[in-house]
Every structure is written in structure tokens, then in C-alpha cells.
Design a protein with these regions (language model features):
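Substrate/ligand-engaging "lid" and interaction regions
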Residues: 1-486
């Protein structure tokens, strides 16, 4: 079968000498996000410098994970990324992979050997939150997790990413080799800390001396990653094939925007990703707060008020100038003042970029999807900034309307009288309140949900007054009119 390797393509394949690449990074979890993000940054570095940092890709799960590794090997580890902008799509053939491994093909031993090679300097991960096998309540490693139990009983034939890392570090220590850096690239807050807790938890359960060696010799930098990469569908793959002239089963589509902020804390060298747009910083937390409040906060605002206003996607809300203006004002006038950013951070440029991303019609990010699980998202995205304004006397009318929009949305009926499919772990509580209360009484009852509003906000007369007024306006005038009046 013809592949992207042996076809005439409308886009250039990597032109550098592939033999110069060394597998200096072993990456666990070769999913769509990694292929559109870290592997792409590494590709651009190879393209523009004489870097030799290549990636040894590892997938651990059976099924699709194995099929992807096999498909990559059939096309010399090349694959396509389609960056879909509002006006046009740019295709790139990515060539940063040096090897691709899977336990069913290469055995556990093959993967552990790759991780224990002298040149392996970084082991990176995109294994999703559940891949860290943490106990939800304590945040510590869950020793009852079936994968972790297996890895404690069979340490040299692990199944979890954490098990592979601990055993590979044991092998390096035994051989007298320098440790590697463990770099999480998952979209999890303080992801380096999450990875460290998991690795040390398993090492401690296996051998306290090994845990002490890891604590002393391994670093776990935090990273903040941002790029919208929808899961590949048959339609996406066909669309890319039509543009490419050949079918690529490993292709993925994403938005043009990408961001990567990395804590500069490596034990064994690192690529100069900052030469191709990444940022190395001393502390990632301010950037996580920036993303949480400016991006996620305005996303929630647009999701509730957009859905109520009859808009299906975030891009649809951006066709209304009042919504565009409100989202930008929320970011710059109400969220930006709550942040403590390093000198030289241009929040105005960031907000402008976010509006551009929100306006991209090819992404089809549904307002209903972003509105899910509001009880879990509201505190960090909208309520914490409100608390800072209440302390410092700032203006927060957009935040008040955002909170009121969430309250109106949880009524479960839209402005046309149609049912809203509210998806939230606290849905039963909302339904109970909806059956008993309306108007200002309903606001008061919702504010009594201490899991969301804690004890301080319901006691604050300014907060209660502003949110109640915004809610009553929404019920009387509708979302579009209220957003236009901001």
C-alpha cells in the first residue's frame, strides 16, 4: 500500500539526515496530543538547528495503542499534522521520531532497555490523569490500583507508566548511569508534582533506598501545555487524505495555536525548545493561573451565556460583537488584574490570541460540552477571582454575569422553554432546588451549596446582591441582551 513515504506529496517531507537523530527522549503515551505538541516542537527544532534530540515513542496499552505503533513503523515513523486555521489548513510531515516500541512487539525488556540506555536523558509522559494511578482523595499513589499491584508483584515486567519509570531508574542506578528527567506533559495542574508523588510512592513501596536515590537524582519539572487537538475521526482522516493525496492512518488535526511553558529543571540536558516557541521559566504556576482564569474562565462565561443565547459553538458566540467584546473585557479588566505574572508577560497579546482561537470555526467546540461539570469548574475559574476583587475593591460585573449564567443554565430549561441536558455531579441538588425555589430564593438556595461557594461568599452582601441582580436580569431580558448591556 502507498504511504506518505513513497508518494508525491503537496508538502515537503523532513529534509535533514534522519541518521543524526539519537533516541535521547523516551516518550510514554504516543497519543494525538503528543504528536501535535511535543513531537512537533522537537521536529521544528531539528528542522532549524543541528539538534540530535530524537524521540523513542512507547505505547503501553493493547488495541489501538499497538496499531498506531505498527502504522508508524510502516511509514518510517513519519506522520501528518493538519493545523486548521479559520481560513486555511497547513499540512506538516513530522519527523522527530527515531523509534516506536510496544510491549506486545518489543517486550517489557525492550522498552526498559531503551529507558536505561546511557543517551536517554528525558522520559516524558502523556498518559492522562488516570495514568498516574493516584488516589483521588489523598493525591498519593493508589497501592490498590490493579496496575500498581501488578507492578509491585512483577517489578521487572511492569504494566503502568509509573512502573516502567521506577524499574528503568533502578536499572540505571545499578549500572552507575546518570538518572533521567521525568517530564509530564499532561494537562494536569502542577503535573511534575503529580508525577513525582507517583514515582516516589511506588519506589518507596519497592525499596526505600531506591526512593531516596530517585529523590536525590531525578527532577520532575512542571509544564503547562496548550493546544486544542480533537480526537481523530474517520472524517478528519479522510479530509487530510483528500488534501494529501494519500491516506495517513496516523494523521491528526489541531488548531494553529500552540503553547508550552516548561520549568527549567533538568538533570541530564534538554533540547533548546525555546528556539522554536516554548518558554523555559523558573515557576510554571503563574502561567497555569493565567490559562485557568483567562482561557478557561472566559470559556465558561461564553459556554453558559452562549448556550442560553442560542449558540451551539464557541466560534458561533464570537460572531456576535457583544460576546467578543465581553469575553475580552472579562479577560483584561477582571481576570488579568488577579494574576501575578513574571515581568515582560504581555497579557493583552495573550487575550487577543485567545479571542482569535475562540473565533476559529473549524474547531466546533460546543458550548454544551464546556458547560459540563460547572460545579467543579466554577470555584477556580470565576469565584476565586471574585474573592480577590471583593478584597481589593475591583470591578467584576462580567464575573457576576458569568456566575448568574451558570445559575440560569442549571435550571435545565433554555430561553425557548426547551430542556437543557445538564451534566454535573451535583445535578440532583440542582433539581431539588429547582423544584422548590425560584427568583431570588433560588439564587439563595444555590449559594447554600458550600461545595461550590464555601462559607464566605454567601455571607458577603455585595456578592449576593450582584449575583442576584444579574440572575434576575437574565431571567427577564435573556442572555444576548444582558451581554450587550455589559
Amino acid at each position: 500500500m502507498t504511504t506518505i513515504v513513497d508518494s508525491n506529496l503537496p508538502v515537503a517531507r523532513p529534509s535533514w539526515d534522519h541518521s543524526r537523530l539519537e533516541s535521547r527522549i523516551v516518550h510514554l503515551g504516543c497519543g494525538a496530543f503528543h504528536r501535535a505538541h511535543q513531537a512537533l516542537y522537537t521536529h521544528h527544532l531539528l528542522e532549524s538547528t543541528d539538534s540530535d534530540w530524537g524521540i523513542c515513542e512507547v505505547n503501553l496499552m493493547p488495541g489501538n495503542d499497538r496499531v498506531l505503533i505498527e502504522n508508524l513503523k510502516k511509514q518510517q515513523l513519519l506522520y501528518t499534522v493538519a493545523e486548521k486555521g479559520a481560513e486555511s489548513t497547513e499540512l506538516k510531515i513530522i519527523g522527530s521520531m527515531k523509534e516506536a516500541l510496544h510491549p506486545e512487539i518489543d517486550g517489557c525488556e525492550g522498552i526498559l532497555n531503551a529507558m536505561a540506555r546511557p543517551q536517554t536523558a528525558i522520559v516524558s509522559l502523556t498518559v492522562t490523569e488516570k495514568g498516574y494511578c493516584a488516589d483521588a482523595a489523598s493525591g498519593q499513589l493508589d497501592l490498590n490500583n490493579p496496575l500498581i499491584k501488578h507492578d509491585l508483584e512483577n517489578p521487572t515486567a511492569p504494566k503502568s507508566a509509573i512502573g516502567y519509570i521506577v524499574e528503568a531508574l533502578r536499572l540505571r542506578r545499578e549500572k552507575g548511569l546518570k538518572a533521567f528527567t521525568v517530564m509530564s506533559c499532561d494537562n494536569v495542574r502542577e503535573n511534575g508534582h503529580v508525577a513525582k508523588v507517583a514515582v516516589l510512592g511506588l519506589a518507596q513501596a519497592r525499596d526505600p533506598q531506591l526512593a531516596a536515590w530517585i529523590e536525590e537524582n531525578v527532577t520532575f519539572p512542571c509544564t503547562m501545555v496548550d493546544r486544542i487537538v480533537p480526537a481523530a475521526t474517520p472524517e478528519t482522516l479522510q479530509e487530510i487524505a483528500d488534501q494529501l493525496g494519500v491516506y495517513d492512518p496516523c494523521a491528526i488535526a489541531c488548531e494553529p495555536f500552540r503553547q508550552w511553558v516548561i520549568e527549567d529543571n533538568f538533570v541530564n540536558g534538554r533540547p533548546d525548545w525555546d528556539k522554536v516557541g516554548a518558554q523555559f521559566v523558573a515557576d510554571v504556576v503563574p502561567f497555569e493561573m493565567m490559562k485557568l482564569r483567562m482561557l478557561n474562565g472566559s470559556h465558561s462565561f461564553l459556554a453558559y451565556l452562549g448556550y442560553l443565547g442560542g449558540y451551539e459553538t464557541i466560534a458561533d458566540t464570537m460572531t456576535n460583537p457583544a460576546y467578543r467584546k465581553a469575553a475580552f473585557s472579562l479577560m483584561m479588566q477582571e481576570q488579568a488584574p488577579t494574576l501575578s505574572m513574571p515581568e515582560g508577560t504581555d497579557l493583552n497579546a495573550y487575550a487577543t490570541l485567545l479571542i482569535e482561537r475562540f473565533s476559529n470555526p473549524s474547531l466546533r467546540h460546543r458550548t454544551w460540552q464546556i458547560a459540563m461539570d460547572g460545579s467543579q469548574k466554577l470555584p477556580q475559574r470565576l469565584l476565586d477571582p471574585v474573592r480577590l476583587h471583593l478584597q481589593n475593591g475591583g470591578n467584576w460585573r462580567h464575573l457576576a454575569l458569568g456566575v448568574a449564567g451558570w445559575m440560569r443554565y442549571t435550571q435545565g430549561v433554555d430561553e425557548q422553554g426547551n430542556a437543557i441536558d445538564v451534566v454535573d455531579p451535583m445535578l440532583a441538588e440542582f433539581q431539588k432546588i429547582n423544584a422548590q425555589y425560584q427568583g431570588a430564593d433560588r439564587v439563595k438556595a444555590l449559594l447554600g451549596l458550600s461545595g461550590i461557594f464555601a462559607d464566605d461568599l454567601p455571607q458577603n452582601a455585595d456578592f449576593v446582591g450582584a449575583v442576584t441582580a444579574a440572575y434576575q436580569q437574565l431571567c427577564e431580558r435573556g442572555a444576548r441582551e444582558c451581554v450587550a448591556a455589559l
